[in-house]
């Protein structure tokens, strides 16, 4: 279990940590010289019941409040320290205000320096601290009087921490390792003979020696060489634990890891310049949180300047809640639920705090009612509830983006997707969730759009898949439209012939003259096999003009009987299916699962120029895709069946 201290300067936070652990958390020479905590300090203790507790000791001086924020934003349990001889002071109030704004789950009050005052004074300060905690929503929090110098009360506080640690361990065991690994870096340094070390409190997932990770938002790839926790080597570290990670990697000049960066699984690398937050304005704010205000955003262990845009109004009054978009001066690492604190541009006053709702925030339309409704739908911490609300609002949800923003692991996404409330469609790499009602409605819209297309072009068999999808591309993601089209085909509401689609009642026909001429052209195309005759060669064979042959072939093409592959050459669907199968066989036989134009030419026996025309046509139809000098296969001959 990890706890942080909080409280005013010189109220005995570091001495309390030393009394509980035997460790002086002040590590900097200046701290020891001045007797003043400047930066974060760390200490560990093993309690009598075997529970291991880590302490993050934060500075109390207002000048060092950014360092305090770096210590508490990823921690759920805090000791609020107040000196008996001084009572609550300004930084007591501001620290508690911050803890309230970021919704720290548990605060324990500790009254220090009780040996310096009369018992009546101790009781009075206990009452004052209890009132402050109650006003902040922590009315059930215990308050312990202690003296770090004499040891009075330390044992009682330690017993309380034992119970708290046991409860925390039970909750961690019940929750399991949630999500992929993420850790905000609060220290980065180099040790002789060891190399680069970064430290932090694990926010999600787990890390092990040998893992390949990324430093975000910079994007440098690293490998975990070693791990330390509780001052000893360890093999793994999980959410809620502090650890030091020895990493190996290559960094650009000036791009070495620093406080504010994240060490995380590469799949969770999401540099963001614009964030949508849910923010509560501080109860102690002297003025509302106004739209357009320049701010400091504290997130994870980072401190970055940005500008606030209040989305549901022009300002948020003290103690009130609203959505705020922050445009940042530089990228940060952020996902849903990350805690954030806003301070004024001079970094002297806390304006508000809350959590990230959407790290993929759009600038355009950010204040529209539909966008605000989406933000409301994103709010629930439970992924299943949030997904249900998003589907109710949008009816289609990109599951890959949802998993990224929510930091859901593969197993968690699978469990989420295995529900009757919606359908999972799309490819494994780009899954989409859609309600059955929305899929049915999209199908109806596609049928209507296809009917209108037939009316506009009655002599044409039907459009290609790309054209059909394009008819409603603005209405839904391609995966949803593709699934709706597949459902229509399975039910017989639409018919596919080759690469073209039509309604079953639509039966385009050639006029009698064209049908008669087609009967003479077809045997010539069949006889040509993989190299059908050119238009002028067909015209010469039939003693007709090339224009007449071209015109009839184009009308036949509209019916799906042929496809124009080159300027002067038409192919039958069956022949195209053979060519697509050749491409697939070549790719399957290749270790790289790809083939070149030369390989296709040698296998098919057609000339170089015609090979290029054929392959470019297969690319256009979605059967193949060119990557450099080679091609991969996306579909075989069934595309033209």
Residue ranges and their predicted role:
Residues 9, 36-38, 44-49, 70-74, ...:
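Conserved catalytic network of the ASCE P-loop NTPase/AAA+ motor domain
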Residues 52, 77, 207, 212, ...:
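Residue-level marker of beta-strand positions
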Residues 1-58:
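Conserved G1/Walker A P-loop phosphate-binding module
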Residues 114, 131-285:
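Conserved catalytic-core segments of large NTP-driven translation/proteostasis enzymes
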Residues 5, 117-121, 128-131, 143, ...:
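C-terminal effector modules of nucleic-acid-centric enzymes and ribosome-associated factors
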Residues 52, 58-63, 72-124, 538:
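Conserved Switch II/interswitch segment of TRAFAC-class P-loop GTPases
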Residues 61-62, 85-89, 104, 113-118, ...:
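Conserved nucleotide-binding/hydrolysis micro-motifs of P-loop NTPases
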Residues 10, 16, 35, 55-57, ...:
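Residue-level signature of catalytic and energy-coupling elements of molecular machines
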């Amino acid at each position: 279990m990890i706890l942080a201290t909080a409280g005013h300067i010189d109220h005995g936070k570091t001495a309390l940590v030393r009394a509980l652990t035997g460790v002086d958390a002040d590590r900097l020479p200046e701290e020891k010289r001045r007797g003043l905590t400047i930066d974060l300090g760390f200490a560990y203790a093993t309690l009598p019941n075997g529970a291991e507790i880590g302490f993050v000791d934060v500075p109390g001086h207002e000048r060092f409040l950014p360092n305090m924020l770096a210590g508490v934003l990823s921690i759920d349990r805090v000791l609020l320290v107040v000196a008996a001889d001084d009572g609550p002071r300004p930084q007591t109030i501001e620290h508690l205000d911050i803890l309230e704004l970021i919704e720290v789950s548990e605060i324990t009050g500790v009254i220090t320096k009780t040996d310096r005052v009369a018992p009546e004074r101790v009781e009075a300060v206990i009452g004052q601290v209890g009132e402050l905690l109650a006003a902040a929503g922590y009315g059930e929090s215990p308050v312990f009087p202690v003296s770090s110098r004499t040891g009075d009360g330390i044992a009682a506080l330690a017993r309380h921490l034992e119970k708290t640690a046991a409860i925390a361990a039970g909750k961690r065991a019940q929750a399991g390792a949630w999500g992929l690994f993420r850790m905000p870096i609060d220290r980065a340094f180099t040790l002789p003979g060891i190399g680069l070390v970064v430290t932090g409190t694990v926010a999600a997932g787990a890390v092990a020696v040998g893992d390949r990770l990324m430093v975000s938002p910079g994007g440098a790839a690293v490998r975990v060489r070693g791990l330390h926790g509780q001052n000893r080597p360890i093999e793994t570290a999980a959410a809620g634990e502090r650890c030091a990670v020895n990493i190996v990697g290559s960094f650009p000049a000036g791009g070495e890891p620093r406080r504010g960066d994240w060490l995380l699984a590469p799949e969770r690398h999401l540099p963001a310049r614009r964030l949508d937050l849910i923010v509560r304005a501080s109860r102690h704010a002297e003025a509302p949180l106004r739209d357009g205000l320049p701010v400091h955003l504290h997130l994870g262990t980072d401190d970055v300047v940005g500008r606030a845009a209040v989305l549901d109004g022009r300002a948020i009054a003290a103690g009130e809640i609203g959505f705020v978009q922050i445009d940042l001066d530089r990228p940060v690492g952020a996902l849903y639920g990350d805690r954030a604190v806003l301070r004024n541009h001079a970094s002297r006053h806390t304006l508000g705090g809350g959590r990230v709702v959407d790290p993929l925030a759009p600038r355009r339309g950010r204040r529209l009612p539909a966008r605000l409704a989406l933000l409301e739908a994103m709010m629930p911490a439970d992924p299943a509830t949030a997904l249900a609300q998003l589907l109710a609002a949008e009816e289609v949800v990109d599951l890959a983006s949802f998993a990224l923003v929510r930091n859901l692991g593969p197993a968690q996404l699978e469990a989420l997707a295995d529900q009757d409330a919606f359908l999972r469609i799309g490819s494994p790499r780009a899954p989409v969730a859609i309600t059955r009602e929305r899929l049915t409605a999209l199908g109806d819209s596609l049928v209507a759009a296809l009917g209108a297309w037939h009316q506009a072009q009655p002599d044409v068999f039907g459009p290609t898949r790309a054209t059909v999808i394009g008819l409603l591309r603005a209405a839904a993601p391609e995966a949803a439209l593709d699934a709706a089209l597949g459902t229509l085909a399975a039910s017989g509401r639409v018919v596919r012939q080759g690469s073209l689609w039509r309604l079953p009642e639509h039966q385009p026909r050639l006029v009698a003259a064209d049908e008669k001429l087609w009967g003479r052209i077809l045997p010539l195309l069949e006889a040509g096999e993989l190299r059908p005759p050119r238009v002028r060669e067909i015209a010469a064979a039939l003693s007709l003009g090339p224009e007449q042959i071209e015109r009839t072939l184009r009308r036949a093409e509209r019916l799906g009987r042929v496809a124009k592959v080159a300027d002067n050459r038409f192919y039958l669907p069956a022949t195209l299916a053979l060519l697509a199968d050749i491409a697939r066989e070549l790719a399957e036989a290749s270790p790289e699962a790809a083939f070149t134009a030369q390989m296709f030419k040698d296998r098919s026996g057609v000339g170089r120029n015609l090979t290029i025309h054929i392959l470019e046509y297969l690319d256009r139809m979605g059967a193949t895709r060119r990557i450099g000098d080679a091609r991969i296969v996306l579909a075989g001959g069934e595309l033209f069946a």
